[in-house]
Amino acid sequence: MRAISKPATRRSLVAFSRCLATGSLVIATAVAVAPAARAQSGADAVFAVTYLDVGAGAVPQGVELIKKYRDQSRREGANVEFTILQETSRPNRFVIMEGWRDQAAFEAHDKGAAKAEFEGALKPIRNSPPDRKMLQPFANAPARRIEPGALYMVEHVDFLGGDPAIAATAAPLEKTLAEASQKEAGVVRYEIYRMPPPRINHYQVVAAWTDAKAFDAHETAAHTLEFRAATAQGGRAWRANLYDQRLYKAL
């Protein structure tokens, strides 16, 4: 058997090392540039959900515009979340879920150039003015990794009137629903936010499941059915909008 010369061996090792280094660099670069949609937030964090739409013929333009705004916003140091969602059944409708380190950071972004540029470009192609709701964490869970293809659900929950008794009854019902839903096998996000006083009878659910099958399992789960029975007309806390779920995909 002919022995491999030492120079050839050294050349092979050098080439192999270069391949490893290049591969490691590619992996590290991919990890570094992949933006985190959510980060752990502190007690002073401020959140908002915004519903918006564009004309049916302007969907591609709207998608590019909202993606640009997302990328600009995520680069701001005080941003803790900037998730954009597109409605599955009506692709001209979108949701922005954003979070900021504190009120000062939120206000700085709100008055910044990226926000002004986005709203200026959106105005000619939108059907309606954006509808933004300020939120406070109510029943939240640590951020998890959400893989592509997850099915999102955003729901606004409005309990009738400003009756303190109704608000007091609704709060534990919402907590119980969140805690049970967060334990589901297919759930990757289930969080309930509440609007600031005096509108404490308004909640916002932002949730995601691995796929449609996991979402369907949530819909028929005992804790979901119990919550809906308790909040339907004649229940312990009446809802004004029992059927206000919308399904989305992440952009």
Task: Tell me what each language-model feature is.
Residues D53-V63, D158-A170:
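Short, surface-exposed ligand-recognition loops at beta-strand->loop->(often short) alpha-helix junctions
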Residues Y51-V54, E98, H156-G162, A207-W209:
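Short beta-strand-to-loop capping motifs
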Residues V33-A39:
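Sec/Tat signal peptide C-region and signal peptidase I cleavage site
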Residues M1-F16:
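N-terminal secretory signal peptides that target proteins for export/translocation
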Residues A39-V46, T83-N92, E117-L160, R189-N201, ...:
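Glycine-rich beta-strand-turn "strand-cap" elements at beta-sheet edges
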Residues D44-T88, V95-E98:
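The feature marks the first
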Residues R2, S41-G42, K68-T83, G99-K133, ...:
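An amphipathic, aromatic/His-enriched active-site/gating alpha helix that lines ligand/cofactor pockets
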Residues S17-A32:
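Bacterial N-terminal signal peptides
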